Structures are given as C-alpha cells and as structure tokens.
C-alpha cells in the first residue's frame, strides 16, 4: 500500500490512509538516519497550511528524534523558505517541508533536501525499502525541537535584495489561495510599502475559496474579477498552496511559466536558460537570439540537477516553477519570482506587449491519458521506436530527453510519462490551431494502435 506514496520527486499521499502515525514515524526515523549518514548534524522542518500538518509534524519529529538528529522548527511557511534555510541564517544541513503543494486538501507529503540536493528518484525508491523495515518499530512521541524564525530572516533578505521597490507607486493584485504564501506576502508588502490588493491571505487548510492550483483557469476567477472591476489595477499574481509556483495575469492574459521565463531572461545579461520539455517553441527560439538555452526533463529535482551541470542562470516549467540562480540560490521560489516580475514593471518592461510581439503559436491544453503504472514507460518507448521507423509524416527531429518531443517544423508534439501518476501527458503546439489539432490527431491515432497491441 505504501508504494504509491514514494513518488519520483517527493513523498505524497492521503492523510490518515497512507500517511499515518506508523508510516510517518518510520519515515522520520529513516530520514534522520539517512541525513546522519550523509554528514548532516541538523534539519529544519516546516509545513504548509493543511489541516493535517500539525499531526504529521509530530509524527515526523518523533521519528527524527529517535534517529538522533537535531531538529529546528521553522513553522508554517512556504516551501521556498525551507530551501532558503539551507542558504541563510544558521544554514541548516537538511530540510523537510510537510506540504501537499497544489493537491486536494486531504493530501499531504514531504519534500526533502539534504546537503542542498533534492532527495529523489533512485535514492527515494531505495529509501522506501528502509521505511518498510521499520514500520513496526516502537517509536515513542518525542517532540523536542528548537524554534527558528526563518520568516523574519527571509523578509529582511528580500527587502534588501529589492530595496529599489520600496514605495513603488504601482497597483497590483495578489491571490495567496489560503495557502502558505500569505504569511510572507503580508509582511513583505508592508515592509516594502507596496500598493497591493491581497486576497485570501489567511492560511486555511480547507482552501475555502478555491483549490490551490493557479494553473487551473477556474482558480483564477476571483483575482481576475478583481482586475476587471478595478481599472487602475492591470496586473496580478497568484500562488499555489506552498508558494513554490507563481502565475501572473493581466486583464486579458495569463502568463505561463515559459512566458515568464522569456520575460525574465530579457533582464539577464548573456543568460543561460533551461526550459523543460513542455515549454513553447517561442522560448527556445527567442532566447537563442540573445542567450544560450537548453531543453531538460520535467520535474523540480531534475531541473535543479541540470542547472548545476550546465551552470544555468534561470530555469522554468510551464506550470509556474521558476528557478533563479541569477542573483539567487537556484531553487523554485514563487515569491522571489513575483518580486522579479515587479522589478520588470519597475524597469519599464511592458509584459503584455512583449508577449504579444512573439510569433503567434497555438498550444493545446495538456491532455492526460490514463494508463497502467507498469506500462507507461514501455508505451512511450514503443512510441519512440515507431517515430524512428517513420510512422508519422513530416517529422524534422525527435528529442527523447523526456518522452518524445517531435518537431514538425511548423509545430511540435509531446508524449511523455508522468513521473508521479499513472498517466501519459501530451501537448501540441503549431502555427495554427488547425495544425495543432492535426498533430494531436496523428499522435493519438498512432498511440491508439500501439496501445491496442499491448492489450493483445
């Protein structure tokens, strides 16, 4: 039953079912041992606004204490503040954030960083075997921690980094989605004396106003309505549940992560940029005119790894994860990205006009295909083989860095396996909507043939 909680990038499951006293105490104990074995002397632990956070914190801390590692409680804070705690202040050796990110309210999980490296992939799978061995251990409640105020340190750091924004006479909206963002946004806005209309700042684990995923159009309706009703507000920002993602929107446009990446790149000298495999052709074509750009795998852990390997200044996912190494520490931080977006406005960048000036491309929404967990990677491999054999007309090139991204010259198609769920994910982009739909039809016809063969 616990197999499902150990994902590619983190640990995630239903509170009370997969994430219960027995499993979380065992996770804490095994994590403490792993951290000690990697030379860590301490760990910071924080959590988001979910109703299950306190109980999971107690279970996790009890396990960590049994392992014998020093624990610092950084409280209810966004995930980026957990990462930040490894770089500033006491500069902790490891961090665990208890967060369900953008998932429904009954979910929760753990994002783990050890010695500034994401704990994921093969290591996390091997770790799961250790957890199984200790599921029946008698781990007593031990809540011994030392409190640490990372929030004040973070706000002070941001105020110093963005001191030029103080008293900036520009009105904008912010939707904190009743997640963890509000605990930072409110003191930050106050300290910089910014003219912001802040919505849903109160942390509420029930997410009473809307779900904590700003990439879903329905979750932007409240902040969009505010923009439309107030002529002197032209831009707004929305965060996900743990504020490692940010979406910007105007009265007429939602800026996706790849569009934001392009805008940010224009403000970096000779930039080295990384875009995930789902990013628009515009990002790769346009950045190549003034910088260097790479394509990489989806997933925050994969991106952080490649950023180090390629000395990347800035990376992005379409979903709103923005990673700044330029003037920052190289992890995804929605609040930092929000401040960098305000910086663009402060410098006179017209964000909407800059995006409108790009070549017009038509992108389909992400389509998920439900498949068996055991078959998903095999199906993608078979699809890649068929492309290599010439199964589709007009193929210019095939990129297999993460699934199959097929370039047709006037558009591209993507089929990749989700690393976290039993789905294949598709995306299509072309110079016309008709062509994008045509590519979609071609890919689905081929995939249906492959899937039928698997059943026989």
Describe the function of each predicted region.
Residues 40-48, 171-173, 272-277, 313:
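Short glycine-rich phosphate-binding loop at a beta-alpha junction
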Residues 92-105, 227-254, 294, 300-333:
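Glycine-rich phosphate-binding loop
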Residues 42-107, 188-248:
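N-terminal small/polar loop signature for handling phosphorylated ligands or for N-terminal nucleophile
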